[in-house]
Structures are given as C-alpha cells and as structure tokens.
UniProtKB/Swiss-Prot annotation:
Enzyme class: transferase
GO cellular component terms, semicolon-separated: cytosol
Gene: pgk
A molecular-function term among this protein's GO annotations: phosphoglycerate kinase activity
Organism lineage string: Bacteria, Bacillati, Actinomycetota, Actinomycetes, Micromonosporales
UniProt-annotated location(s): Cytoplasm
Protein name from the UniProt record: Phosphoglycerate kinase
Residue numbers binding substrate: 24-26, 41, 64-67, 123, 160
Species this chain originates from: Salinispora tropica (strain ATCC BAA-916 / DSM 44818 / JCM 13857 / NBRC 105044 / CNB-440)
Length: 399
C-alpha cells in the first residue's frame, strides 16, 4: 500500500486550511539552564513546515518532550522550543498553553494563513500514551478537531502506538511529511538490497537492546563491527576477562551463539581504553581487549581497534552506524567514537547514521553533518524498521 505525501496534500490547495503536523521536537535540554542543548530535531522538520507556510496553510504543530507522565510539568514545557522554532522559521510561532483546551482552540482560531502555532506537550495529557483505546481515542478526537488535515513528520515516534501518531490519522486526511518520507526511503534501501559490501557499526551499552537488529542484519551484512559497552558481553562470550566493564551475564550465551553463526562477520575490539572508575578524570590507559584487569572498566575502544574498524569500512559501498563506541560525553573516552565517525564521514559509501546517541555524537563532536548521506532522527524507530517490525505510525499512514 502506498503512502500519500506532503506534495499530494499541497497539490490539493491548502491555503487557509488548518494542517496538524506531528513533529518530533523531543530535544535534549541542559539540566542546569533548561535551554535547548541540541536543536537538530527542530531543524529536521523545517522543510515540511516551510512548505506549508509558503502554501498559506494554518500550521498547527504538536509534539512530545520527555516523559512527564500524563500531567503538566513545567520542566517539560515546549515553550522554549516555540522560541527556537520561530527563530529558525524567521517568523513568530504562536504558543498554546495547553494541548486541546481553551488556549489551543483560541490559538488555532486566531491563526492567519501562513502562520504557525505550537501546542503544549502532548504527554501532558494521559490520553496521548494510554493503552486504553477509548481514552486514547477521545484525546485523538480532540486533537483532530483542531485541524482539517494531518501530516506525520515525527519519524522518531512512528514506532509508538500513541494517539497523535496512530489514532489521529484515522480521523483526518493524512500524509507523510518530507522527513518521514526520506527516512522510509533510506531505511527501505538498507532493509532491501543495499549495495555491497555492506558494513554495519553497532555500539551503545546493551546487547539486549540491539539483539533483534543483529539477528535481522547478520544475513545481509558483510561485516558487523561491535563497539561500545555491548562489546564486553561479546568479549566475555569469547572467554576473555572484562574486569568491571559493563556486562550482561544473561546475554553471554546468546552472544556466543551469534559469534558461531556469524561465520567471522562480527569484528570485536582488540584493545580498549580502561579506567579506574566511571568518571571523566579517572586514571586510564589502553589495554588488550582479551585481558582487561579486574576492577578496571572499559570506557572506549582503543586506537588499534579504531584503525581496524576504519580499514573494514574503507571498501564499503553501504554503511549503517548506530550507537557510540565509548562514553563520548567524557572527552577522555570520545576518541573511539570520533575515529569511527570520521572514517564513516570520509567514506565514499552510502552512509546512514541511525539516530539517537549516534546523531547526538556527530553534533557533540563537531563533525560535519553534511558528510553523511543521511542522519536518522529515529533511534528506536530506525532499529525497529530494520528488524522488520510493523511501525504503528507508518501503518496508520498507509491505511
């Protein structure tokens, strides 16, 4: 089944029509100042919003931010996001103090053609994330009443069966925004027949979080490079000592089985940066990955591993990267992530960064985002797509 697109909606004339755009404005906030720490997700929705503004639509944007547990919490207000969105659009964004209440209704009613409103955090209402279909549906009814058409441009949320993602499209003419369409095209290529050699780089802390995607990708890839905290469970499965490094004991046997079935495709670190403690200023040095001293904790892949991973990436035609190679938030343990990211960025391959912490690392390390073919805005969503799962938000757009 095909998905109707933003261009299909624009062709129908949207001047003066109220268009509800589900965006993913779930940006990280600085814990001290409350300011936006990374506006990448706001920038990602600009092509869709700009097209609607230029077409004269009355644009109503909605999003979640954080996990406020179904009631208003000023810590998770979208007000700062409205300010930044207005700066990026070059025009004021009208902010509604609630999501479907009096403020939302009056703010939307007052919009002129080509103006933009942002509703308060969707998750301030328990109906957004409710598992009760009636409660979720009632909230979806209220949201849908604010608009004449619906655009989903929140790829980072399409794996959630939430009211604004799954239920609202059933109540309004619905299309995919520019971002969602691009994500589906790119991930469809990776899930289908990508150009070979196809090399996947996986990091992050837990094997259990990536097990399903490893199972799905192993038959398709030529090499699978494993770094980050998850590598220590694989090293343990090979019989090596991992000191006090992160270890999922219950996953050791699973990793052993994966290594046996992988037939040499899985490449693990040969050296790691081990520290005396999990702290930015902890004493640390590089040790062999097959014998991490007891009471020491591996916090990054070592330089020999970076060189080996870079060599494995050199001849690739397609590269997918998800998850940092170490604790990149601490400068002493960011070298592995930087080295691998730079190897991917300088590759001639079709390169996809799989959202979440990987996308954050690209920006935090000051790397050129344009050097990558695509940086996904959906961490969990991109992995679930590659696992072959049905994503509720995509299914809703297809219906």
């Amino acid at each position: 089944m095909t998905i109707r697109t933003l261009d299909d909606l624009l062709a129908e004339e949207v001047t003066g029509r109220r268009v509800l755009v589900r965006a993913d404005l779930n940006v990280p906030l600085d814990k001290q100042t409350g300011q936006i720490a990374d506006d990448g997700r706001i920038r990602a929705v600009l092509p869709t919003l700009s097209a609607l503004v230029q077409a004269g639509a009355k644009v109503v944007v909605c999003s979640h931010l954080g996990r406020p547990k179904g009631s208003p919490n000023p810590v998770f207000s979208l007000r700062p996001v409205a300010g930044r969105l207005g700066e990026l659009l070059g025009a004021p964004v009208h902010f509604a103090e609630d999501t479907v209440g009096d403020s939302a209704r009056s703010t939307v009613a007052d919009l002129a053609d080509g103006q933009v409103a942002l509703l308060e955090n969707l998750r301030f209402n328990p109906g957004e994330t409710s598992k009760d279909e009636a409660e979720r549906g009632a909230f979806a009814d209220q949201l849908a009443a604010l608009a004449d058409a619906y655009v989903d441009d929140a790829f980072g949320a399409v794996h959630r069966r939430h009211a604004s993602v799954y239920d609202v499209p059933a109540r309004l003419p619905h299309v995919a925004g520019r971002l969602v369409l691009r994500e589906v095209e790119v991930l469809g290529t990776l899930a289908g027949e990508p150009d070979r050699p196809y090399v996947v780089v996986l990091g992050g802390s837990k094997v259990s979080d990536k097990l399903a995607v490893i199972e799905a990708l192993l038959p398709k890839v030529d090499r699978l490079l494993v770094g980050g905290g998850m590598c220590f469970t694989f090293l343990k499965a090979q019989g090596h000592e991992v000191g006090s490094s992160l270890l999922e004991e219950e996953m050791v046997e699973t990793c052993r089985s994966l290594l046996e079935r992988a037939d040499g495709k899985i490449m693990l670190p040969v050296d790691v940066v081990a520290a005396d403690a999990f702290a930015p200023d902890a004493p640390h040095d590089t040790v062999r990955a097959d014998g991490i001293p007891s009471k020491r904790v591996g916090l990054d892949i070592g330089p020999e591993t970076v060189a080996g991973f870079a060599a494995a990436l050199r001849g690739a035609r397609t590269i997918f990267w998800n998850g940092p190679m170490g604790v990149f938030e601490m400068a002493a343990f960011a070298h592995g992530t930087r080295g691998v990211a730079e190897a991917i960025a300088t590759s001639d391959a079709f390169t996809v960064v799989g959202g979440g912490d990987s996308a954050a690392a690209v920006r935090a390390l000051g790397l050129d985002e344009q050097a990558f073919s695509h940086i996904s805005t959906g961490g969990g969503a991109s992995l679930e797509y590659l696992e072959g799962k049905t994503l509720p938000g995509i299914a809703a757009l297809e219906s």
